[in-house]
From Swiss-Prot:
Component of the ubiquinol-cytochrome c reductase complex (complex III or cytochrome b-c1 complex) that is part of the mitochondrial respiratory chain. The b-c1 complex mediates electron transfer from ubiquinol to cytochrome c. Contributes to the generation of a proton gradient across the mitochondrial membrane that is then used for ATP synthesis. Belongs to the cytochrome b family. This is Cytochrome b. It is found in: Mitochondrion inner membrane. It comes from Proechimys guyannensis (Cayenne spiny rat).
Length: 379
């Protein structure tokens, strides 16, 4: 009699994905972030579901309903802060996951990579709409500023903005549709994650050496299940410390003021995980130019397979490219800092320089460095 996990049509799929999956024996902790992102997604869906049971998507009661969740619902404060800080953890892991893909040349798995980029867009859209739901000052003005950017699209822009708003300003209709989209998108993301994994398992995982590892594979369980559980414990510990000790550390105090269309906050800024893109948007004085730069700052990830000039897949044995990648990381940290600063000298200039260097490093310096390394190795 064959083993049930190998013969049952449904369990067989799980077995081939998480138990008997042949995995390279040398993948490092950088490969843990995929599973951590999966855990974050499940956590967000569960906490979000419980929040949706008590939340009302109406401009008059939205802010009060969030207050009610925190004050009156059993462990509502915990669920709310787990959801808000869970989003921050999600983005930390997402950026690490993308960074690992760039460092180790995982973008050569074209389908997996491109679906991953689309996934990151979907996650960003979901997070943006979620930020609007508490209907605080930053929720309202953030929604107004970001949706207004679509008016920069030639000819159809202004009509498109009013169509998204459901009126002539961000109001009840906007909040209702944002709640609907925020609720449904995570399930679409889950389906896309499955496609992401499907394509990954077609090729098998990459590894730190970048070499073919078919001759040296080990089963996923128990080796990597244990390794993933360790990562999960670290994640839960960090998340619980954040929730229980300083739940508002990453939030904006302005969002504790109910939305008021007649009073603009002095500094409108998104959540910390969007600040780098926001800094790029603000660094261009032209509205359409800024919007294009904003979109392209993420869409540029799709160009990585085309910009790969090295004869080696990973950066493991390429010190010059490694240095350049860490310069890019430092650049992104500077952009994140600038995004949270007011629009005045010297922040404007720093933001413009950091934005130019962001695109220059990816489009010019990284490919030329790769070609130079090929020459140095006489390839």
């Amino acid at each position: 009699m064959t083993n049930l996990r190998k013969s049952h049509p449904l369990i067989k799929i799980i077995n081939h994905s998480f138990i008997d999956l042949p995995t390279p024996s040398n993948i490092s902790t950088w490969w843990n972030f995929g599973s951590l992102l999966g855990v974050c997604l499940i956590l967000q869906i569960i906490t979000g579901l419980f929040l949706a049971m008590h939340y009302t998507a109406d401009t008059t009661t939205a802010f009060s309903s969030v207050t009610h969740i925190c004050r009156d619902v059993n462990y509502g404060w915990l669920i709310r802060h787990a959801h808000a800080n869970g989003a921050s953890m999600f983005f930390i892991f997402l950026y690490f996951h993308i960074g690992r893909g760039i460092y180790y040349g995982s973008y050569t798995f074209m389908e997996t990579w491109n679906i991953g980029v689309i996934l990151s867009f979907a996650v960003m859209a979901t997070a943006f709409m979620g930020y609007v739901l508490p209907w605080g000052q930053m929720s309202f003005w953030g929604a107004t500023v970001i949706t207004n950017l679509l008016s920069a699209i030639p000819y159809i822009g202004p009509s498109l903005v009013e169509w998204i708003w459901g009126g002539f300003s961000v109001d009840k209709a906007t909040l209702t549709r944002f709640f609907a989209f925020h609720f449904v998108l995570p399930f679409i993301i889950t389906a896309m994650v499955m496609i992401h994994l499907l394509f990954l398992h077609e090729t098998g995982s990459n590894n730190p050496s970048g070499l073919n590892s078919d001759s040296d594979k080990i089963p996923f369980h128990p080796y990597y299940t244990i390794k993933d559980i360790l990562g999960l414990l670290f994640m839960l510990m960090t998340l619980m410390m954040l929730i229980l000790f300083s739940p508002d550390l990453l939030g904006d105090p302005d969002n504790y003021t109910p939305a008021n269309p007649l009073n603009t906050p002095p500094h409108i800024k998104p959540e910390w995980y969007f600040l780098f893109a926001y800094a790029i948007l603000r660094s261009i004085p032209n509205k359409l130019g800024g919007v294009l730069a904003l979109v392209f700052s993420i869409l540029i990830l799709m160009l990585f397979p085309a910009l790969h000039m090295s004869k080696q897949r990973t950066m493991t044995f390429r010190p010059l490219s490694q240095c350049l990648l860490w310069v890019l990381v430092a650049n992104l940290i500077i952009l994140t800092w600038i995004g949270g600063q007011p629009v005045e000298y010297p922040f404007i200039t720093i933001g413009q320089l950091a934005s130019i260097s962001y695109f220059c490093i990816i489009l010019i310096l990284m490919p030329t460095t790769s070609l130079m390394e090929n020459k140095l190795l006489k390839w």
